[in-house]
Amino acid sequence: MILPSGVSLIDRILNGGLGTGLFTQVYGDAAAGKTTLALQFVVNTKRLDFGTIYVNSESTSPLQRLEQMTGMPFRNLEDRVKIMAPKGFSEQGALIDELELFLRENVKLVIIDTLTRYYRLELEDKKTNYANHRELNRQAGILKGLARDHDLAVVVLNQVRAQLRGNDDFEPVAKNIMDYWSDYTIKLRVAKGTGERIIRRVSPDGEFSDGRLFLMNSGFTSERPDEKE
């Protein structure tokens, strides 16, 4: 099954939309619109009458943004959107272990926003780094298994770090682990224009892999705001 975003450019880059059974990684710098991109799929998945489980490890809740994008209060959405908020890396792992218990028949989308936030905080203690790498790999593997075994689309948002070669580009946190599990990898970055973002499909290779999006209150659009007037 394909879950479209409702934005033609995004769906073309993803070969129609999010594929169920697949693990999609989205990474980008701060304010690039990773959460908005994820919520774009939440909104459209609800329109298709399917459900979403949204695991939020960020310090801010996606509720206000979701209400802004849909123009309706969350109470009108909660029959199709379940938001869960772990308080630490180990709690996140325990929640991912139990996700299968929350998969009702209509759930087709699982979003983790972001998988690596608590992981990065744990890395401050160098004595536990190996265990933290192993735990992140375990969590990603469970999510990939859920996607495959339950025919779900899993979207994992990821933070970034500067590349070691010293240019101004960035790479995803825990790149080797995330590359191993990801079927699709999408990169978002802030461009020069107001609300302008660059989206690129890093993998798999293929035609039509990048484009420009514009961030609006209602979500992403592929048309410049002044072109829509």
Q: Which residues make up each language-model segment?
A:
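Conserved P-loop
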Residues: 19-98
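Phosphate-binding/switch region of NTP-binding enzymes
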Residues: 146-229
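A positional/architectural concept
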Residues: 12, 23-26, 185
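A conditional alpha-helix N-cap/helix-loop micro-motif detector
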Residues: 3-7, 35, 89-92, 133-136
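Conserved catalytic network of the ASCE P-loop NTPase/AAA+ motor domain
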Residues: 16-18, 44-48, 73-76, 101-105, ...
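Pre-Walker A adenine-sensing motif
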Residues: 5-18
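P-loop NTPase motor core
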Residues: 89, 96-177
